[in-house]
C-alpha cells in the first residue's frame, strides 16, 4: 500500500514487459488492482477447467483508478430463498471481481430465520423452515414447464417433519465466521440485517411476549410486528442483536425498519401506554421510538445503524444511515441529507435485480442521477 490519491479503494496498476506493480491507498485498493489485473488476462482465466493453447499475455498499461462511491454493495436475501455457504462465497467472488466492497446480508424475514441465535434456538429449529408458499410453488412450476434447473428447489434444502414437506435452512455461528473470513480476504465488509420491528413473523410466531397478542399472522398488508410496548420484546430484540454484534466485526448493523403493520399497535394496551408515557402522538412516532432505542443499544456496543428509508418517518436520529429503496418516495434522500444523514442509494426502480428488463431497463439503471436536487454538501453524503 502507498500514497494513492482518491477515495478509499483507489489504486494504480502498471504492467511492463518484466513486472506488474499494484499500489493501493488501502487493502481494498490493492484488491481492486488485482481484480483489474485479472480482467486484463484472456477470459479463459475464469475457466474452472485446465485451459491449453492460450497466450497468457496482458497489455502494457498504466492505470490510475479510484471509485466514485466508497460504498459499492449488493444485498442477498437468504430468507425468501436460502443460499448455502458455498453459494454465498460464489457471490463474494463475483463481488470482488466487480470491485464491490459491501455485502448486505438480509438474514431474516417472515419467510425464514437464517442465523443461529444460541439464546433462542427455536428461531432456527422452527423459524428456519416453512411449507411451500406460492412463490416456492411457482419456482417449482417454472423449473418443470420451462425446463429451467435454476428455478428448482434443491433437495438438500428440503426435509420431512411429521409428514410435512418443509423448505429452508440456516447458518450456524461457525458458518458465519467462515464467511466473514472469506469476505475479509477479498476486501469485502459484511452488513448483517435482522429486520425489525416488522418482517419478524419467523420470530414472533415461536416466542411469547414478543408480539402484541398471542395470535400472530398477517394484517391487512404486512405481518404481525414486534410489540414496542413490551419490555420483554425489547429485551428479546437486544439479546438477538447482542449475539449478532459479537459475530460481525464491522462498523454497521442494519435494523431494517421497513413495511411495519401498525394495526395491532393501535389497539395494544402496552403500545398505547408506551406512547402515553413518552408523549408520542402517532404509531409512526412509536416506531421511531423503537428504532432510536435500538440505535442507542447499537451505539453502546460501538456500532452504527443503517435502516430502510421508513426510519425517516416519525423522526430520524442524527447518527443513522438511511438506505433509500422506495423509488416512489422521491424526497427521502433530500430529507435525510438535509439534516446531515448519509444515504445509500438502493432504489427499487433501478436496483432490484429480480425485475424483468421490460420494467427495469439497463438505460434506467445507467442514467440514474444520484445528485438530483441535492446541494454539493448533500451529494457528499451519498
Locate the predicted segments by residue:
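Short glycine-enriched loop/turn motifs at secondary-structure junctions
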Residues: 15-17, 220, 316
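Short, solvent-exposed amphipathic alpha-helical segments in soluble enzyme
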Residues: 37-39, 91, 360
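Substrate-binding groove of N-acetylhexosamine-processing glycoside hydrolases
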Residues: 187, 234-252, 259, 273-382
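Substrate-binding cleft of carbohydrate-active enzyme catalytic domains
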Residues: 69-303
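Short helix/loop capping segments that flank catalytic or ligand/cofactor-binding pockets
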Residues: 30-33, 84-86, 191, 332-333, ...
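Contiguous, structured surface segment used for ligand recognition
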Residues: 1-69
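Pocket-edge structural micro-motifs
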Residues: 1, 15, 24, 78, ...
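Solvent-exposed loop/turn segments at secondary-structure junctions
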Residues: 27-29, 39, 81, 110-112, ...
